[in-house]
């Protein structure tokens, strides 16, 4: 499957927003209407926050800036958006894990709950190869192969 060069961050932000919204939904005390407002506002806030810190050609660049973190203190972006739907800080702390790390990077969104939890991938897409040789001719030929190449010896008899 080939991908065109993609510079937008829509799938990654949608994955992050969907995950955070589902965490709020599981407790059942936030109405669907308020969750929709939260989702839209969070999508807008993250898009604005990340716009000068999104580097598809170097996905790890800016990763710390894009990281959403709850470590007994609420991430400021989540706090701001939650206040728009009337959720207070204490309510947020009841609804969300006390320790959550959410990495929103080009081509991958992953999270960890707790300091020692496993990292789980929410969204993953293979990065686009550039014309600068991320895929060499040899690698391109090997891509379709499921088994290692066989070695052949050619002999010439006289």
From Swiss-Prot:
One Pfam family per UniProt: BTG
Top-level taxonomic group: Eukaryota
Cellular component, GO, one term: nucleus
InterPro entries to which the protein is assigned, alphabetical: Anti_prolifrtn, BTG, BTG-like_sf
UniProt modified residues of type Phosphoserine: 147, 149
Entry's family note: Belongs to the BTG family.
The gene coding this protein: Btg2
Record function comment: Anti-proliferative protein; the function is mediated by association with deadenylase subunits of the CCR4-NOT complex. Activates mRNA deadenylation in a CNOT6 and CNOT7-dependent manner. In vitro can inhibit deadenylase activity of CNOT7 and CNOT8. Involved in cell cycle regulation. Could be involved in the growth arrest and differentiation of the neuronal precursors. Modulates transcription regulation mediated by ESR1. Involved in mitochondrial depolarization and neurite outgrowth.
GO biological process terms on file: anterior/posterior pattern specification; associative learning; cellular response to phorbol 13-acetate 12-myristate; central nervous system neuron development; dentate gyrus development; DNA damage response; negative regulation of apoptotic process; negative regulation of cell population proliferation
Tissue expression remark: In brain at embryonic day 13.5, placenta, amnion, and spleen, which are proliferating and/or differentiating.
Origin species: Rattus norvegicus (Rat)
PTM characteristics: Phosphorylated at Ser-147 by MAPK1/ERK2 and MAPK3/ERK1, and at Ser-149 by MAPK14, leading to PIN1-binding and mitochondrial depolarization.
Subunit structure and binding partners: Interacts with PRKCABP. Interacts with CNOT7 and CNOT8; indicative for an association with the CCR4-NOT complex. Interacts with PIN1, inducing mitochondrial depolarization.
Entry keyword set: Phosphoprotein, Transcription, Transcription regulation
One MF annotation (Gene Ontology) recorded for this entry: transcription corepressor activity
Matching SUPFAM superfamilies: BTG domain-like
Name of protein: Protein BTG2
Induction note: By nerve growth factor. At lower levels by epidermal growth factor and membrane depolarization. At much lower levels by fibroblast growth factor and interleukin 6.
């Amino acid at each position: 499957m080939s991908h065109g060069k993609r510079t937008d961050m829509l799938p990654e932000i949608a994955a992050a927003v969907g995950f955070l919204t589902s965490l709020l939904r599981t407790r059942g005390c936030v109405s669907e209407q308020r969750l929709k407002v939260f989702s839209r506002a969070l999508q807008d806030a993250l898009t604005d926050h990340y716009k000068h810190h999104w580097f598809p050609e170097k996905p790890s660049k800016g990763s710390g800036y894009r990281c959403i973190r709850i470590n007994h203190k609420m991430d400021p972006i989540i706090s701001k958006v939650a206040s728009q739907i009337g959720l207070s800080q204490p309510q947020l702390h009841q609804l969300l894990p006390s320790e959550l790390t959410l990495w929103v990077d080009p081509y991958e969104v992953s999270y960890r709950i707790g300091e020692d939890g496993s990292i789980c991938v929410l969204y993953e897409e293979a990065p686009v190869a550039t014309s600068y040789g991320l895929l060499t001719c040899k690698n391109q030929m090997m891509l379709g192969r499921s088994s290692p190449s066989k070695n052949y010896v050619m002999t010439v008899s006289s």
